[in-house]
Amino acid sequence: MLLVLDLGISSLVLVVSLVLPLIGLFVRHKWRVAAQRREEIRRLLIHASEEAARAELEASVEFSSVAVSNVFHCPVCYCLATTRCSRCKAVRYCSGKCQIIHWRQGHKDECHPASIVYDSEDESDSDLRLGEENGQNTPEETLLVGPEPVTIPIGESLLSNRARSPEDGNGDIADNKDDLIDKEEAVSVAETSGSSFSGFSSSPRNDSGDEISRCESFSSSESERSESLLDAHVSVEPEDTCFSTIEDAPSKLLSPKFVHLVESVDNLANLPKLSVHKPEDDAGQNQSQSRSLHSLVTDRHPVSADPSLKSSDFWGTALGSAERVSDSCVKSKSGRPGNSSLHFSFGSGSSRDTSAAKVSEQRSSILKEAPRGTGYISDGVNLRERNAKRFDEAEIALPISSSTDALSPLDSSNLSHVTLPKSKSASSENGSMLAPLKVGEVQLLASKASNTKKCADLMKHSPLGAKSVRVLDHQKQNGAVVQHINSLHGRSGLKASVLKVVDQWTRPKSENEMAGRHGHKGLFPYEVFAKLYTYKIEFQPCGLINVGNSCFANVVFQCLMFTPPLTTYFLQQFHSRACTKKEQCFTCGFEKLVVKAKEEKSPLSPNGLLSQLQNIGIFLGNGKEEDAHEFLRFVVDTMQSVCIKASEYDMTKSSKLEDTTLIGLTFGGYLRSKIKCMKCQVKSELREKMMDLTVEIDGDISTLDDALRRFTRTEILDGENKYRCGSCKSYERAKKKLKITEPPNVLTIALKRFQAGKFGKLNKLIRFPETLDLAPYVSGGSEKSHDYKLYGVIVHLDVMNAAFSGHYVCYIRNQNKWYKADDSTVVTSDVERILTKGAYMLFYARCTPTPPRLAVCTKTEASNKKSRVPLPKANEKSTISRSVSTSSPELSSNTPGGGRSGNIQSFYSSFQRLQKILEEDSASDSSSLFDSNSDECSCSTDSTSMDDFADFIFGDHQGRAHGQSETPSPTSSSSSSSPPFTRRSPLSRSSPETYGTSRHQLPLGGER
């Protein structure tokens, strides 16, 4: 019998045949994965190198040297320009095609005929300069009013291009031929343009030293070309001094303006008299001449002979109250009472000999029959802007006669200025819309009279530092008494500046002024802001279509739509109603998006806003992966610049106005940085503007509170980060500490999930609360409530843990309901799930809005006036700022010495209150009243002891309170001018502590 022996070879073969293929498949899979990883790393390295090269190229372009000034480039294609705009002469092109493209892009809204530009490079409260005061021969000015032109002497230096670029600053560039063409076309356009304006032509003349004068011509915007509305003759009359001192001259020059005379709803009840005044200095005395423009009215606008005809309250609309002054208070030199006149006064700071040049000897016969004794300003003379920027500041003298009211006459030396807020208000009566009034200062001119008394209760300082006063209400004018205090008198300029501080601290801010600030588009009243902030509105988010890597913009737009004050503001369409450039305005485009999102439920396309990205930032463009945090900063900065431009104020001299815009009240806050040198123990302190916070989350940080504690803890500056000490003149080790001094109403926190030189993303979970208490990180935070509520979260979804690629989604809250917005998809969500997300940006809204400290600092409570406060110690030193208050309060008294004790008590009460506010920064060892680096007020180097205060208050303040006038000295004159503010845009001086890192540190990019 055969025996079969099984050696197990078949089983071994079976096992080997099965295991070896499996091993081969596994090795092959591993090899493929490794190859894919190597390819991905190679791709990432190539991408990173391209990004670095592009960043270096952009940085080199950004910091390249300025081009030669005599080379002009086309604004469209940046080629060498060979021609220029035939109308404004300001923009140069390489061809007519580029000119047409630029015209359609928006130049048609900015192009204005060449006109006079008044240079004001060195402005102060005591000096005015017209153009370039070089004393050369002056040409003549042709005023196109009526059928025949009238020639008036004018300074040659005043003829310059308004919109000339900085490269055109040298006078050697423009040739004589271009200048001749400019002047000829200015006259031709004045004769043929659809909106008529003043044209000027120049011709040589001899050295006569005649005064530099300016006139404005008015024409109706609704008149037919064949019908003349206005006929005028110009004459020169000697007049009394327009300004008693050089300090009374206006502090800002006028911009040239093409204004129009609109048809009156009252059929021109009374026609004012237009005159031009100019102060001159001759042998220590002020002399002036007035150039009067006696206007005639055609049959289309008959002059009513009824003096009792009431106007439509033009000034009441612009200012909130109607103003009426008696003719007995303001008399002309000729002694003719009852002449109602409207004076346009232009001051010149140059001193030269003057001679009266008779321009026209004939006067209008209709003017003699014009009614006299009218006490109101007719609405027939309304200023409507047309095709140009409006007046920066215009001075209008309003001596208006009245046969019913009798006031004491004004002394000619006591000229008072009334500051009118530049508003854009318009009201309608009888179907007529009032045009925006662009007036900077209104001057109550007074002529010499036998009896001199003080007529009205005035105040001296406006919110912008100009010498101005506010006219009392019509009900208070009959028995009012003027207290004209010469702030430049005294034995020293220091006491004069202290007097100004006393005047400002002892007078409360009226509610009318706060309400009047709403007339400024860029000065947003806090009361209105608080109402918008706390207003509840039901608003469900609407999806936004991704138009090509636009998820970074969609999440920012969604969060801004639900920012508390902006939601109501844009839904009410407040901005678009006042904006003049709706097509090119980014804020108007965003407002349209918010309104459509409220009305429609289907997803919207943000393509209209994204097309303007090149106007927002140099690094942003369509189809590119961008960082949401960087884009948010650009959007906020753009909206802030729109508010600032709309306010039409020079922010370098009024930098505090940045905090009073809608965006400033919403996102604006302040950080304080303290650095102490460890070698010399010298401390330095810097206060910076803050629009958001960027906090580090690396290391052992796991919560938002940990990140904020690291942000505000003391840091040692050593190694490459050594501090350059100004005392040691070398780099030394130092201690640095950051603190939030003024937290914003809307706090935006960016978690720094990227690092310089690394491509990976910090994909760790950072827990954040729904309600944030910011008090531990705020200087003096225990005295106020700093509770914030979460309303928006932006999350970055990365691809392979990369920081420069991925996708953005956001979570937003409205009426305690949370929504998730993923481009065009919007679904509901819950807060528990949101708090566990890897957030990149957090949006917190303050539970109770708080005004800026600047407004709190300048407010004076009525109870503080009645309380007695002990005087400070005599040995205490303090620095007094020359321009502390931003309000324009009143200093009134019915008796010559009345209210003196209350003023002193209120002064020291305000002194201690301000000192207490500044002492909230308890870590500061500075003993001065105002820190030199503080943005609370302007800087000053004057220091005085309380002995000087006592000498000032009990010495010559009594004479000032009685309104005694003295001759101002040059020293006191120079000490009254406020030092100019120099400040850049908040985002232009960003620091890593304030705004996070720059684009070169690879922020998070977003894409599908």
UniProtKB/Swiss-Prot annotation:
EC numbers on record: 3.4.19.12
Record keywords: Hydrolase, Membrane, Metal-binding, Protease, Thiol protease, Transmembrane, Transmembrane helix, Ubl conjugation pathway, Zinc, Zinc-finger
Tissue: Expressed in flowers, siliques, rosette leaves, cauline leaves, stems and at a lower level in roots. In roots, expressed in the sieve elements.
Pfam (any one): zf-MYND
SUPFAM superfamilies recorded: Cysteine proteinases, HIT/MYND zinc finger-like
Factors inducing expression: Regulated by the transcription factors NAC045 and NAC086 and up-regulated by salt stress.
Polar residues bias spans: 284-295
Residue ranges crossing the lipid bilayer per the database entry: 7-27
Changes seen on gene knockout: Exhibits reduced salt tolerance. Reduced shoot growth in response to salt stress.
GO cellular component: membrane
Subcellular location(s) of the protein: Membrane
Reactions listed under catalytic activity: Thiol-dependent hydrolysis of ester, thioester, amide, peptide and isopeptide bonds formed by the C-terminal Gly of ubiquitin (a 76-residue protein attached to proteins as an intracellular targeting signal)
Membrane topology label: Single-pass membrane protein
Domain of life: Eukaryota
Domain USP: 542-847
Outcome following mutation: residue 551 to S: Abolishes deubiquitination activity
Family, similarity comment: Belongs to the peptidase C19 family.
Self-association and partners: Interacts with SHM1 and SHM4. Interacts with HIPP27.
Role played: Recognizes and hydrolyzes the peptide bond at the C-terminal Gly of ubiquitin. Involved in the processing of poly-ubiquitin precursors as well as that of ubiquitinated proteins. Involved in salt tolerance by modulating sodium transport activity and repressing cell death at least partially through modulating SHM1 stability and activity. Involved in cadmium tolerance by interacting with HIPP27 and probably modulating its stability.
The name this protein goes by in its record: Ubiquitin carboxyl-terminal hydrolase 16
